[in-house]
């Protein structure tokens, strides 16, 4: 079975906690703090693999977590970083944030890598907090939680040419004729329910990949007849063969069919509608085809190249194939999006100090990515940790915001699930 979508969860490893320790050696009085830093958490990395063809593996395993960093120790010993988790996915997979819809990566080359969840940094040990005014700090940090997100994987076929058209117009027969593909062929609608890929090899050694896209119907852009699934496969193609039953063998008007499918492509994506199109007038061996071909040429001949063919006899297919081979080098590939680690770090580093203050019953609730990270990394069981957290509230403007909202001694504050009581 062909799977082209999967929803998974990924999480980078948490950073290890920093240590609180002091150097205690003979003949070294007042040795000072020696707590080492925690190790960085591992990353989750996707690697494109041309040997994979489907997303079926992600149906059975949906959670991917990298290793956490080890905790720091005394004698300034830093924790070991967590191991990265490498996950192989098929070439052609588009990776999206399932919650925001943001495209994180479009992996189109074998070996291409993208970091989809960064590991958290290790917490600092108390040796990092020594200053002229505090020679023996007893504060350290917990490790930063690893980045986590829900991902939507979409496998878009890496085909140069996509065959589109109503069901039963002969697309499967055409692809079986021009390539080595062996699709299921029968005289009923929706015979093709998954895309068929075939490689077309020319006599001069050139080749290109064609995809027999399952049959579209009117309303496909709204999802009718599995329309969204079918149209999704067309987006990656550079050239479209619009296949028509020119004989009208099922009592359909080929010109009307062309207009309906063209409108479905436009409704789904204007970029897709602007893709170069060759019209394939199939079933020329059936009576009535010549008359319809003349009518089609009169209406569309100035705007499109029309190729009369017969998939049953092979007539006209060679001319069609060579026309496609000539056109493809001049057609640019669809736009590619890649989110790499450095870009991601830059975005994170430039994020402003933002928070939101709301009321929930008796609680003042403070939310925001940065302050929640500080809560998770603070060791509240240590007095120095509490003191440092208070300074963070002041530096970020949260203390002033709470006072402006009328907070009083004894009122309750909640941040990242931790509850505090306000004091002077």
Swiss-Prot record:
Naturally occurring in which organism (per UniProt): Desulfitobacterium hafniense (strain Y51)
Gene name for this UniProt entry: obg
Family in the record: Belongs to the TRAFAC class OBG-HflX-like GTPase superfamily. OBG GTPase family.
HAMAP family named in the record: GTPase_Obg (MF_01454)
EC number(s) per entry: 3.6.5.-
One GO cellular component term noted in the UniProt record for this chain: cytoplasm
CDD domains: Obg
Protein name: GTPase Obg
Cofactor: Mg(2+)
Domain OCT: 347-424
GO biological process: ribosome biogenesis
Function noted in UniProt: An essential GTPase which binds GTP, GDP and possibly (p)ppGpp with moderate affinity, with high nucleotide exchange rates and a fairly low GTP hydrolysis rate. Plays a role in control of the cell cycle, stress response, ribosome biogenesis and in those bacteria that undergo differentiation, in morphogenesis control.
Residue ranges constituting the OBG-type G domain according to the UniProt record: 159-329
């Amino acid at each position: 079975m062909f799977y082209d979508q999967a929803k998974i969860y990924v999480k980078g490893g948490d950073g290890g906690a920093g240590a609180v320790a002091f150097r205690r050696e003979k003949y070294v009085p007042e040795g000072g703090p020696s707590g080492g830093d925690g190790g960085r958490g591992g990353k989750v990395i996707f690697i494109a693999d041309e040997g994979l063809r489907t997303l079926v593996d992600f149906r059975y395993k949906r959670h991917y977590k990298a290793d956490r960093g080890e905790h720091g120790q005394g004698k300034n010993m830093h924790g070991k970083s967590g191991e990265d988790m490498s996950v192989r996915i098929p070439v052609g997979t588009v990776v999206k944030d399932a919650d925001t819809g943001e495209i994180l990566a479009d992996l189109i080359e074998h070996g291409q890598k993208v970091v989809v969840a960064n590991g958290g940094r290790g917490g600092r040990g108390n040796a990092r907090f020594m200053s002229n005014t505090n020679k023996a700090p007893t504060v350290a940090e917990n490790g930063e939680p690893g980045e986590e997100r829900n991902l939507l994987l979409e496998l878009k076929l890496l085909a140069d040419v996509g065959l589109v058209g109503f069901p039963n117009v002969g697309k499967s027969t055409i692809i079986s004729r021009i390539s080595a593909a062996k699709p299921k062929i029968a005289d009923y609608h929706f015979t093709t329910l998954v895309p068929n890929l075939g490689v077309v090899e020319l006599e001069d050694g050139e080749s290109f990949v064609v995809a027999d896209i399952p049959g579209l119907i009117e309303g496909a852009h709204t999802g009718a007849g599995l329309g969204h699934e079918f149209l999704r496969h067309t987006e990656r193609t550079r050239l479209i063969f619009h296949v028509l039953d020119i004989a009208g063998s099922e009592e359909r008007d080929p010109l009307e069919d062309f207009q309906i499918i063209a409108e479905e492509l436009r409704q789904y994506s204007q970029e897709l509608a602007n893709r170069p199109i060759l019209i394939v007038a199939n079933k020329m061996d059936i009576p009535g085809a010549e008359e319809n071909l003349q009518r089609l040429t009169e209406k569309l001949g100035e705007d499109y190249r029309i190729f009369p063919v017969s998939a049953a006899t092979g007539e006209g297919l060679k001319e069609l194939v060579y026309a496609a081979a000539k056109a493809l080098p001049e057609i640019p590939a669809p736009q590619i999006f890649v989110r790499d680690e450095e870009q991601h770090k830059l975005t994170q580093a430039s994020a402003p100090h933002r928070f939101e203050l709301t009321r929930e019953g008796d609680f003042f609730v403070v939310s925001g990515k940065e302050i929640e990270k500080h809560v998770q990394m603070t060791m509240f069981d240590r007095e120095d940790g509490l003191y440092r957290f208070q300074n963070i509230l002041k530096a970020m403007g949260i203390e002033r915001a709470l006072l402006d909202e009328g907070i009083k001694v004894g009122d309750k504050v909640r941040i990242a699930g931790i509850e505090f009581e306000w004091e002077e």
